Amino acid sequence: MRPSGRTAQQVRPITITRHFTAHAEGSVLVEFGNTKVICTASVEENVPRWLKGKGKGWVTAEYGMLPRATHTRNNREAASGKQGGRTMEIQRLIARSLRAAVDLEALGEQMITVDCDVIQADGGTRTASITGASVALADAINHMIASGKLKKNPMKGHVAAVSVGIYKGEAICDLEYLEDSAADTDMNVVMMEDGKMIEVQGTAEVAPFSHQELLDMLALAQQGINDIIEKQKAALAE
């Protein structure tokens, strides 16, 4: 039995609130149970120096956590003068996931930066960030189309992510903190809405996992991501 009483394949209650902040071209509060992340997408009419003159745009991301997003306070990374390795890994993952969903040539020489700020963490912050960032990105692109900065939509489709793992000998989907901290195996999966995978990150935290367990986790991830993408579509239709 899972701590929350959920079935193995059941994701947490998901809420996606659009237009959450006033100034960004796209902004979302995404909630996966008690994990809450603000995702804002900002448009700039320039690209990194190495892309200038190439007729392509760029999508990048930054990630951070409020000091008391977790059970005990963490110092702000700015206080130490550098980002931690975990932070850099996660923001690169978010950026790669979003770029896979965008035709960068169709974006033109414009850049979209998506900031993901975790205000409360209960497991799955990177997967919630990707899910919310995709909606914020879609809103920013729609804003660009409406303002004449784009003639066509460069998004190839929705992208979403979910965690899966082996907990008490069973493959489960969308781990909360109590499960994540006690899991034998932890895996994050990022997929497009057509079912193609963007990234699979899996680690045997306690015990190695079998080929069959890998297949079980991937099947749960696909089912969970399908459910999450329906939530994204419903939010964007409002």
Swiss-Prot record:
CDD domains: RNase_PH_bact (cd11362)
Enzymatic reactions: tRNA(n+1) + phosphate = tRNA(n) + a ribonucleoside 5'-diphosphate
Top-level division of the source organism's lineage: Bacteria
GO BP annotations, alphabetical order: rRNA catabolic process; rRNA processing; tRNA processing
EC number: 2.7.7.56
A Pfam family the protein falls into: RNase_PH
Binding positions (phosphate): R86, G124, T125, R126
Database matches in InterPro entries: ExoRNase_PH_dom1, ExoRNase_PH_dom2, ExoRNase_PH_dom2_sf, PNPase/RNase_PH_dom_sf, Ribosomal_Su5_D2-typ_SF, RNase_PH, RNase_PH_bac-type, RNase_PH_CS
Keyword annotations: Nucleotidyltransferase, RNA-binding, rRNA processing, Transferase, tRNA processing, tRNA-binding
A single GO molecular function term of this UniProt record: tRNA binding
Assembly notes: Homohexameric ring arranged as a trimer of dimers.
Entry function: Phosphorolytic 3'-5' exoribonuclease that plays an important role in tRNA 3'-end maturation. Removes nucleotide residues following the 3'-CCA terminus of tRNAs; can also add nucleotides to the ends of RNA molecules by using nucleoside diphosphates as substrates, but this may not be physiologically important. Probably plays a role in initiation of 16S rRNA degradation (leading to ribosome degradation) during starvation.
PANTHER family linked to this entry: EXOSOME COMPLEX COMPONENT, EXOSOME COMPLEX COMPONENT RRP41
Family, per entry: Belongs to the RNase PH family.
Name the UniProt record assigns to this protein: Ribonuclease PH
Species per Swiss-Prot/TrEMBL record: Aliivibrio salmonicida (strain LFI1238) (Vibrio salmonicida (strain LFI1238))
